């Protein structure tokens, strides 16, 4: 997004300008429109992210749940080490400022505290009507802007600091959470308020508060906890050992995701067994508590070896992900001293194990939420 020109509607500079300068200050910070306008704004930002990479989801910075100091660690360093081993600029550290250069924050931001804002946020959550909730939440929202400092401290330039979007995602999350216990419709003045410059899909009509009343209308929900194990590749043993401490957390679902960008040369049933390193092609699946599920891979089966390049061409250059839910299999690892292993057994149509080289996976990920 940073590299796209200002003339591109999905460019960072274009979207950042909608909040303040150089656009005519579209943002709403009064009533009606504060929460609804910013929800529409975040939706536009998320759509722009997806146009570049559909796997990206805008995260939120939860400054509202307890004592915190400084901005999130992911936003503190100017560089980070990419998974490929290269040190690259951190896009969450700063953004391109209006007029040139990079955005900045308060010099002592790493020692500034935000814990008291959690109390104010909880007070806001206790309001029984929308107007009171919106008014109460606006205060700590503004305090975060001020304490981050630098470009974030003024409406005109706040949108140019990437942390703006993490901050407002949390404001939006708090509203969504409040709505769960207060499902009444928005006041009429909020529902009919036009959210300039955001338009309804395939329409010349501006969106209104009624179009963003719930996150479901926009196709997303907030999770209390969401955690990714960094992508890993298969070894010759087909067994992945994971630190059990990572799983001693409260969770609702656990999904294993296979990322791929190429066709498979072989058709296979890639079976996943949890904490059963001895599982093989003959291990039963039905009624087996260690069986997490399987990835059904439909391969070329052309009777000859295919090069990696040919398999990628065969996929049409598209990426695809397959996932299975292994939540039930992870219930037993809460016990102290337990370890977790994932044994991936590729079984061909003939019932025999398929060599690991034929598995068309770029990487695997484990998602807990």
Regions found by a protein language model. Name each.
Residues 1-369:
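C-terminal accessory segments of proteins
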């Amino acid at each position: 997004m940073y590299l796209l020109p200002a003339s591109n509607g999905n460019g960072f500079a274009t979207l950042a300008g909608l909040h303040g300068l150089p656009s005519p200050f579209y943002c709403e910070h009064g009533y009606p429109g504060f929460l609804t306008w910013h929800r529409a704004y975040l939706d536009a930002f998320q759509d722009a992210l997806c146009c570049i990479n559909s796997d990206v989801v805008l995260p939120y910075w939860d400054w509202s749940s307890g004592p915190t100091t400084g901005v999130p660690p992911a936003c503190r360093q100017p560089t980070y080490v990419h998974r490929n081993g290269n040190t690259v600029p951190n896009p969450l550290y700063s953004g391109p400022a209006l007029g040139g250069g990079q955005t900045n924050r308060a010099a002592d931001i790493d020692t500034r505290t935000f814990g008291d804002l959690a109390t104010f946020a909880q007070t806001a959550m206790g309001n029984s009507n929308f107007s009171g909730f919106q008014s109460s939440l606006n205060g700590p929202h503004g305090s975060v802007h001020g304490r981050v400092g630098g470009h974030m401290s003024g409406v005109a330039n706040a949108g140019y600091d990437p942390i703006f979007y993490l901050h407002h995602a949390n404001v939006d999350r708090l509203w969504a959470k409040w709505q769960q216990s207060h499902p009444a419709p928005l006041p009429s003045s909020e529902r009919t308020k036009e959210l300039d410059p955001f338009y309804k899909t395939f329409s010349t009509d501006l969106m209104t508060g009624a179009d963003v009343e719930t996150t479901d209308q926009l196709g997303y929900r907030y999770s209390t906890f969401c955690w990714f194990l960094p992508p890993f590749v298969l070894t010759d043993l087909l067994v992945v050992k994971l630190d059990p401490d990572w799983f001693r957390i409260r969770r609702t679902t656990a999904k294993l995701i296979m990322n791929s960008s190429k066709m498979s040369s072989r058709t296979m049933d890639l079976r996943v067994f949890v904490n059963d390193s001895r599982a093989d092609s003959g291990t039963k699946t039905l009624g087996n508590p260690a069986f997490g599920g399987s990835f059904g891979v439909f391969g070329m089966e052309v009777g000859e070896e295919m090069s990696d390049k040919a398999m990628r061409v065969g996929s049409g250059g598209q990426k695809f992900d397959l996932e299975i839910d292994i939540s039930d299999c992870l219930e037993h690892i809460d016990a102290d001293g337990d370890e977790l292993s994932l044994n991936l057994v590729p079984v061909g149509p003939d019932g025999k194990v398929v060599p690991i080289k034929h598995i068309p996976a770029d990487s695997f990920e484990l998602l807990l939420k």
